[in-house]
Amino acid sequence: MLPLPTDLPEPELSRNTAVVLQKRYQRKNPDGSLEETPRDLFWRVAAAIAAQEAAYQSPYSPEALAREFYELMTSWKFLPNSPTLMNAGTDLGQLSACFVLPVGDSIEEIFDAVKYAAMIHKSGGGTGFSFSRLRPRDSRVGSTGGVASGPVSFLRIFNTATEQIKQGGTRRGANMGILRVDHPDILQFIRAKEKEGEFNNFNLSVGLTEAFMQAVEKDAPYDLRDPHTGEVAHRLRAREVFDLLVKKAWQSGDPGIVFLDRINRDNPTPDQGEIESTNPCGEQPLLPFEACNLGSVNLARFFTPGHENEADPARNGVDWTELARVVHLAVRFLDNVIDASRFPLEIITETVRKNRKIGLGVMGFADLLFQLNVPYDSPEGLALGERLMAFIQEEGHKASAQLAQERGPFPAYGSSVYAARKAGPYRNATVTTIAPTGTLSIIAGCSSGVEPLFALCFTRNILDGERLLEVNPYFEAALAQAGMCSPEIMEAVAAKGSVKDLDFLPEDLRRVFVTAMDMAPVWHLRMQAAFQRHTDNAVSKTVNLPHEATEKDIFDIYWLAYKEGCKGVTVYRDGCKSVQVLATGEGQKAMEQNQGAAQAADPGADATGEPQPLPQEAPTPSLSAGVRRRPDILWGFTQKVPTGLGTMYLTVNEVEGCPFEVFATIGKSGHSITAKAEAIGRLVSLALRSGVNVRDVIAQLKGIGGEHPVFRHKGLLLSIPDAIAWALENHYLHGEHVGMVSDIQGQVCPECGEALLFQEGCLTCPACGFSRCS
């Protein structure tokens, strides 16, 4: 590797960037101590990628280009995907994030795919599969005389294998499973995730065809075909299947949808086969045994001050010259990654280098809009998004054409659609992709992908249970400019995460600083479509919906995605998974009502789609059934409470509006006090989960004395248990809801305990950078 230059500047790191780099990317010694600094890390990556120039007649020397790549990354204008940051310049050397593997119809082919997936997950990649080639359940198997298990049964094997790799690897395996809508087992597949926790290592999507969508529009039947024989196995009404897709997405967010015919219309190498699947987050359609390496340009870094209020924000306020320079360097970087990467299978190496697909995308779009004073949900916002991506697409293809002159086109160019159109030649079969950037955006200090901000403020866990208020810097600057930057205002914003209903703030500020849940869902979809129109591959984007959204809202989003030319869409209704709770008492009653409603709409089916026998008499519950199980998803609030031992943050999560569990943390109090607070929280939680009324809990805790009482505006707080009682009493008995610091809704981060956000088709933690996908 090229030696580290002594004059190389140190990267400027925020606290968040430093923490994420140290935890996830900097190499460590066997004892866990850090082997490299952030400067070492970025030079390792830059040098390893620039070294590939030596194989070509390049205008750059490897040393000079390594410096440019280093500056590109440490200025936070561009970052490659996580496997490149982790593995470039290491012995592993696997630098790609996305792979697609074929699943054939024989046992040998199926378990080859399981083995190959394990190898890819071990190396840090994610995998996509189509199960559409598998013969349907209960089909006759000629070689044995038995019957086929069907796609969903084998899907469970893939999920279990991934679970084992997750336990041993440094990066969690992620999968996409796709089944064509005309497969005979499609109803079972759509219902596969009805039971929460099933197939938790998979994103599932239904592959919709043009024939199916036309049948939906006409409310006509369509054919289900046995993939083994090609014969029509059954017919279903398309509208009923589409409505079932909508219902399941409303209930749990799964499955998503992809438009397979539309994807294949944009397949640049159709002679090599049909595209059947995508990567786990859905933005990268790939051929079997193909991989793609991704990278993202940080649009927030291309704002030009002084132009933000001009009449045409789609053309002003952006440094287009610098953006073009960065795009050209980024395309060269990503093309070099193909040569630098060591793939886990030889057939993947051959396929990747034959087509040389790259995926250059963006992040920081919402932050750029903030700087330009342009609302996300506005015609101006759409115009800017489309203009930016059209520019990146044009410059990206120019850069790929220049590389083709320098290095030769991708080997499959001669039989590609480009050659037939006399376009190019190009070095890369595809150039652009809008990928999830959850962890990368934390490193770069910007908003994720093309998503709007989920919250303007949120609280972050730091050492010893202390919590720190995080505020979007552009929002904070706008408040300061308006003379309204105060701790009280920040607390008010943090309580909601949004300024939509804070009438004491200026209207123009509230209009610009919109968040994901502030806007009508249609704006999410329109923005996705604006970027899709100028993207070779696809766009990873989540349409966030409020909890009260209806099935019709999701139907409209799906239909608009089809009409607007999107290649797929993922919706997530806030808190949708929390209705599936295993509980007793009132919680059980509510759950049974939910299940009853679901069965009325979808009678006779369980999570496998199998008809169910008549219910039997329920067994007598055991004593252990008295403690309700904790569901994976809860929502609640965090209350800031002063105590004589430090500020306590009391988090209360609820089921059906009733307290279910309590966590108490006290900052800067020492481990002994922290342990006592945790113990009290655990015991209170056990009582609540065992059916003890919150009034009784309050009565037991209230008035317990301590050594360090403090005065509150409504009385004296004597101790930690007394403070917990005070907070519960004010919230549940008096209904005051005072001092709320943050709303929590969704799944919990397994690494830091913060609430996960569902965006860009992926669960991501805004606090520590954990991501299911990156």
Regions found by a protein language model. Name each.
Residues 15, 283-285, 334-339, 409, ...:
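Catalytic alpha/beta core of large soluble enzyme barrels
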Residues 6-11, 96-320, 343-347, 400-403, ...:
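Active-site cavity-forming subdomains of large catalytic enzyme subunits
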Residues 85-95, 99-100, 106-130, 178-180, ...:
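Conserved phosphate/anionic-ligand binding catalytic regions in large, soluble enzymes, centered on
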Residues 749-752, 765-768:
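Short cysteine-rich clusters marking metal-coordination/redox-active sites
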